[in-house]
Amino acid sequence: MVCCFGKKDERTKTIEKELHKERKIMRRQINLLLLGSGESGKSTFVKQMHIIHGAGEFTADEVRAYRQQIYQNAISAMRVLLDARNKLGIAWEDPKRQVEVEKVMRFTVGDLLKGIDFTTFVEVAPIISDFWNDAAIRKTYEQRNLFQISDSCQYFFEHIPRIAMPDFYPTNRDILFCRKATRGISEHIFEINKIPFRFIDVGGQRSQRQKWFQCFTDITSILFMVASNEYDQVILEDRRTNRVVESRSVFETIVNNRSFSNVSIILFMNKNDLLQEKVPKSDIRQYFTDFTGDHTLVRDVQFFLVDKFEASRRDRARPFFYHFTTAVDTENIRRVFRDVRESILEQNLKTLMMQ
């Protein structure tokens, strides 16, 4: 009997030791929740963390999956442009192209979801390339704020000859531009300077936001992503609500939630590269009548948008952090996250000292 109790005691000690070790790790772990509307750049940010603080490269299986997704991105985006060209009544530069339209439009949503293999893609790649070089598609693309299309489509259209090669192997940059809507919740842990950082990425579409509340426990910081270039676009769900207005509404709900009174919330005004392209072409005053700055200056537009989000906070004494980011730019994210990491660790230390 004594011997039996001795074995149980040893097992108990081992379990307690493991639990103590686990609790110690959990106390050190930084839990970051990525929030924001759909297509704001959350998943791209996680990919950057993988490149900067993870393995640096993606596995062969991951690359193969991304290759199929890139094929899907290119076909799907051209389908959108062809449909929009027709609805906008823009005539083909070369009328002969019309006979090729069905070869791209024949792909159903089901086909695209199942995946596109190389053999299928290579059949339509030259057609997609020809369409992209037609002035009608370029004119349609210039009016893309009127319909829903991925920001990354131009990148893939310009790389069609390379993507259509039999030995095409997506680079990290290709993968950063690759788009796939996040469904549900995904978690990624990276050890940075011996401290585990856990990133929780959840879908940003309205239908996915009910899942956000499952992630609200033990959060150290919230990184809230906004696609700053979308000031002249509407959301997919109702095709009426301005995307920046929608993002601000969501941010207001989060930043004023009592559950996050001790959680630092950092605003990422993302897609700064696309904002700089858009400002000279799209007058923000047409969408925000309260804009009083110089509508041709990127800086004025940037700070107008930041002020919109900053004004939604009720607790004015609470620190407000924001950064202008370009999620597909690895060096930009490396630099920004280095600064963000320091402020998060400092805030976490203060919180631990108060416990």
UniProtKB/Swiss-Prot annotation:
CDD domains: G-alpha. Residues 266-273 are annotated as: G4 motif. Residues 325-330 are annotated as: G5 motif. GO terms for molecular function: D5 dopamine receptor binding; G-protein beta/gamma-subunit complex binding; GTP binding; GTPase activity; metal ion binding. Residues 174-182 are annotated as: G2 motif. GTP binds at residues 36-43, 176-182, 201-205, 270-273, 327. It holds the Pfam family G-alpha. Keywords: GTP-binding, Magnesium, Metal-binding, Nucleotide-binding, Transducer. Residues 31-44 are annotated as: G1 motif. GO terms for cellular component: brush border membrane; cytoplasm; heterotrimeric G-protein complex. Mg(2+) binds at residues 43, 182. The keyword Nucleotide-binding applies. InterPro entries: Gprotein_alpha_12/13, Gprotein_alpha_su, GproteinA_insert, P-loop_NTPase. GO terms for biological process: adenylate cyclase-modulating G protein-coupled receptor signaling pathway; Rho protein signal transduction. Residues 28-355 form the G-alpha domain. Residues 197-206 are annotated as: G3 motif. Gene3D superfamilies: GI Alpha 1, domain 2-like (1.10.400.10), P-loop containing nucleotide triphosphate hydrolases (3.40.50.300). G proteins are composed of 3 units; alpha, beta and gamma. The alpha chain contains the guanine nucleotide binding site. Guanine nucleotide-binding proteins (G proteins) are involved as modulators or transducers in various transmembrane signaling systems. May play a role in resistance to fungal infection in the epidermis by regulating the up-regulation of several antimicrobial peptides of the NLP and CNC families. Upstream of plc-3, egl-8, tpa-1 and the p38-like pathway, required for the expression of antimicrobial peptide nlp-29 in the epidermis in response to fungal infection or physical injury. Belongs to the G-alpha family. This is Guanine nucleotide-binding protein alpha-12 subunit. It comes from Caenorhabditis briggsae.
